[in-house]
UniProtKB/Swiss-Prot annotation:
The gene is proB. This is Glutamate 5-kinase. GO terms for cellular component: cytosol. Substrate binds at residues 47, 134, 146. InterPro entries: AceGlu_kinase-like_sf, Asp/Glu/Uridylate_kinase, G5K_ProB, Glu/AcGlu_kinase, Glu_5kinase, Glu_5kinase/COase_Synthase, Glutamate_5-kinase_CS, PUA.
Length: 360
């Protein structure tokens, strides 16, 4: 039995002049049914609420202000789920709506609760359909894209694979629409992702660098670090859906780490919202990065923000580059007090234990 998460992008759902959103969803759902009939499990992460809401309200262009985006999402989400429910019900499947914000994954308890609920739903042969709760999410606690959310969902349920359905055939070395020498990238190992992301960021002044590819690379990095294989596939081609369900290597495959960092470290790295920042010295950086040590007070150079025990902080080196995140064992006030009294016996106090410290 396989458990897959499939993310369906807006570019797929909006359809064409010849094909409506409902027809697109019906084609997708019929393909998904063939996968489910083999005894497999499926979770969908779907975009499209804002687009459908705009369509319903006769708004011609995507809104820029948050309140209008939230309003159109509220209207569109009803239509979106109605379409999925109507089509899947006709095919003999039950669905469940799951709306998530960053705040829902911010605590370990809520992350685990979401994980348990999703797992129970698929055990009951229900198809969970996940979307970001755009109606209540503010800018600070907003994913802004379902690529990142789909990776976190895949980690939460220990999925075998994450499928990113989009409107491009592969990841490319350059924007193929502007560069004739662009070549498709068929396979990517986790160790190569950082370089690919950097190259993409260098081209961020063009449409290719600022669009959906950037978030898909982030999604692939999150999932593969946690041990989940990722496949980027052109979902506008009906034949591709058959190919992926037969485990054929189409599109771009992102291979997971051979030794994944695990569910908890993945959550620490990508799901939590940090409330402070700790700068460490070179010795402490070497200790946590190369030796897997805990962060001790003696290695701390500076503290920013106010935090209490078990809150999340960003950990940076002397160049202010993020090197880790973790949950603190000491409040910011007590840590500052220790830093102001370096001669006392508290310099060996653990600030962030290695079990709750995740390298960036």
């Amino acid at each position: 039995m396989k458990t897959w998460v499939i993310k369906i992008g807006t570019s797929i759902l909006r359809g064409t002049e010849e094909t409506s959103t409902e027809e697109v969803i019906e084609t997708l759902c019929r393909s998904f049914t063939s996968f489910l009939l083999k005894g497999n499990k499926l979770i969908l992460v779907t975009s499209g609420a804002v687009g459908l809401g705009c369509q319903k309200l006769n708004i011609k262009t995507r809104p820029n202000d948050l309140s209008t985006l939230q309003a159109t999402a509220a209207v569109g989400q009803v239509n979106l789920m109605s379409l999925y429910d109507k089509i899947f019900n006709k095919l003999g499947h039950n669905i469940a709506q799951i709306l998530i914000t960053k705040a829902d994954f911010n605590s370990r308890e809520s992350f685990n609760n979401a994980s348990k609920t999703l797992k129970k739903l698929i055990d009951l042969n229900v198809i969970p359909i996940v979307n970001e709760n755009d109606t209540v999410a503010n800018e600070e606690l907003k994913y802004g894209d379902n690529d990142t959310l789909s990776a976190l969902v895949a980690l939460a349920i220990n999925a075998n694979k994450l499928i990113l359905l989009t409107d491009i055939e592969n990841l490319y070395s350059k924007d193929p629409r502007k560069n004739k020498d662009a070549h498709p990238i068929k396979e990517v190992h986790n160790s190569e992702l950082k370089e690919i992301k950097n190259k993409n960021n260098q081209n961020s002044n063009n449409e290719w660098g600022t669009g959906g590819i950037s978030t898909k690379l982030i999604s692939a990095e999150i999932a593969t670090k946690g041990g989940v294989e990722v496949q980027l596939v052109d979902g506008t081609n009906k034949k591709n859906l058959i190919e992926i369900f037969n485990d054929n290597k189409i599109g771009t495959l992102f291979y997971p780490l051979e030794k994944p960092i695990g569910n908890k470290k993945s959550w620490l790295s990508h799901a939590i919202h940090t409330v402070g920042k700790i700068t460490l010295d070179d010795g402490a950086f070497f200790a946590i990065n190369k030796k897997g040590a805990s962060l001790l007070a003696v290695g701390v150079k500076n503290v920013e923000g106010n935090f209490t025990v078990n809150q999340a902080v960003k950990i940076v080196n002397t160049d202010n580059k993020e090197v880790a995140k973790g949950l603190v064992s000491i409040s910011s006030d007590n840590l500052r007090s220790i830093l102001n009294n370096k001669d006392n016996n508290n310099s060996s106090i653990i600030v962030v234990h290695r079990d709750v410290l995740a390298l960036s």
